[in-house]
Structures are given as C-alpha cells and as structure tokens.
Amino acid sequence: KLIVSTDASGREINQGVEQYYEATQGNGIVLTIDEVIQSYAEKAAQRAYELNNAKRVKIIAMDPKTGDVLAMASKPDYDPNQPTKAIYPYFEELLDSYDDDKKINAYYEMWRNTLISDTYEPGSTFKLVTATSSVEENVIKPNEKFTCTGSVTVEGRRIKCWRSYRPHGSETFEQAVQNSCNPVFVELGKRLGVSRLYDYIEAFGLTSKTGIDLTGEANSILYKEKDVGPVELATISFGQSISVTPIQLITAVSSIANDGKLMQPRLVKAYTDNEGNITKEVEPKTVRQVVSKETSQKMLKVMESVVTDGGGKIAYLPGYRLGGKTGTAQKVIDGQYAQGKYICSFISV
C-alpha cells in the first residue's frame, strides 16, 4: 500500500511524506466444510427451491461427534464475486422496490446467512427434544399405550392432532413419534412440567447462541418460564410457541446422535501460515452432557423407526440405517399463523 500526505480536501501535497509498503502474504484457515457434501447440498437446495416454488430452502450437514459443519447451503443466494447483482427474481424485485439510498437494506437481505440469523417454529422436529427429555426423566412407563382421539382439550382450548379426521387411536410411545401425534406430546409435556421441560430446552442449547464462528447469529425466541401456562406448555411440547435457528436445532439433535453430548458447532478447524503450514488447530468443544448414553441409544432406535415405519419413509435408503423426524409448521407472519403458509423440514442422522 502507498501512504501519502494530503491537505484537508484530500489533495496530495507535492512536498509531503510518501511511504510505500510491500504486499505481504496473508495467513489461511482450514474449514470443516466438505466440498463434495457442500456441492450436493447446493444442488439439492436449488432443486427443492424450484420444485416447491419455495420462498427459501436451507440445508445444513453436521458431524455430530465433533460439531463440524460439513455443508451449509441456502437458496436463493448470491454470487460472492458480484455481491450487488441479484441472480434470483426474488432479489431482483426486492432491489427494485428500494430507492438507491436504501438499497443497502435489500443487500443485507440478500447477503444474510439465514441458517444462523433467522428463527422459525420447528414444529414436529422439536418433538425429538420433548421425547428425549421424557425418556431421560422416565415419565413413560414400559410398554405404555397412549390413546389419540383426534384432539385434546387444555384449559378450554381444543388442540388438534394433525390427523384429527382419522385419529391414531391406541399407540405406543415409539408409534406416537412415528405418527407425530400431537396429543401424546401434549401429555408428555404435562408429565415433564414447565420447569423440567425448560431445563432440557436450555440443556439442548436452545436458549442461547451456539457460538459458531460466524457473525450475525441470532438467538431463539420463547416465553419466559414464569409466563408459561398449561396451553403454552402444551404447544411448546410439539414445537409451536418457540422459535429457533436452524443451527441451534441441528446442534441440539446432533447431541442425541452423540451419546447425549452437546458439541459447539465448528467451522474453522485450523489456521495456517502463508505456506500452508498449520500454526494452530481448533479442537472440537464439548458443551455439556445433555442426556445419558442409554437415552441416546433408545432415541436413535425410535428415530430409525420413523424412517422405516413412520412419516419419514421417503428418506429411506436401501443399505443404510437412517433415523429422522419430519416437521411441518404454520408460518408466523406479523405475530399470527398464516393460512396456507408452511415451513416443512426434516432432520436426520
């Protein structure tokens, strides 16, 4: 770089001081991103965006043992080489809607990493938190049967099962997870109580930022514990009345696949000098033990049954053992549930 003397108007002074600094090689970082997985995630997100005419599609892949982020994709996105040029109609319309002096607002919308900065109601994927907490706290009796009549009434409010038109009837805990049966999870939330459920929500990392090494991370939105009544407890139990970021949810569920250990998400695993030699390694960080290894193993079997026998059959891959949980939540707009607007998700291990 070149440093010169200027006057108050920014004009160079002829007899001023001039100093030149040679360019120096910068240091580097080694990311946890797997370029092959990232490529597949980008293509899958684009395909889902087009096929479903979605407003946004988001995908994260994480190694549950280390917290390493292996892929992170979101559509629509932008070209980093031309960051102010919209490459999707959605952003073109957004840019056109702003005056030149306010276009920065549209750019922020385009550049924002929604996987860490936006919250959403997780819907039934959150049932894994309620289910795992219930197993850990032994609030489910061995071989216990639950009954779904299509709805449950809490404090005078009727809460429907998604299949209220054809109730699930008698079902085990495992079948209730497979069926994503709301009334059963209302019952589990009641058995846990507000205090214990909130303890687990906190233990799973859903009340604080994950600490991922990216700027702009948002935190979850949920009721203060003292403000949670029977109705709020019921809806939180099956994933409503709580909003989390995608990175928070995948980190929480990854702990179930990691013998109950919650890891901090990691994006940088090493620093290098200008010749590529590693100067510092970033070790995986265990945040806490959330549940026991035994509970973790039980829940992995339950999650596997969702893919083999439940609502996640579409994710089944011959030759592989997969577990997961589907989720569908009504989109919240201006503080109200919007009719016909949904957030559909799937989380798997």
For each predicted feature, which ranges?
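Conserved, well-ordered alpha-helix/loop/beta-strand core segments that scaffold catalytic motifs
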Residues: N14-V57
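Short hydrophobic alpha-helical segments used for membrane anchoring or interfacial signaling
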Residues: I59-P64
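Beta-lactam-recognizing serine transpeptidase/beta-lactamase-like catalytic domain environment
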Residues: D7-Y20, T24, I33, K65-T125, ...
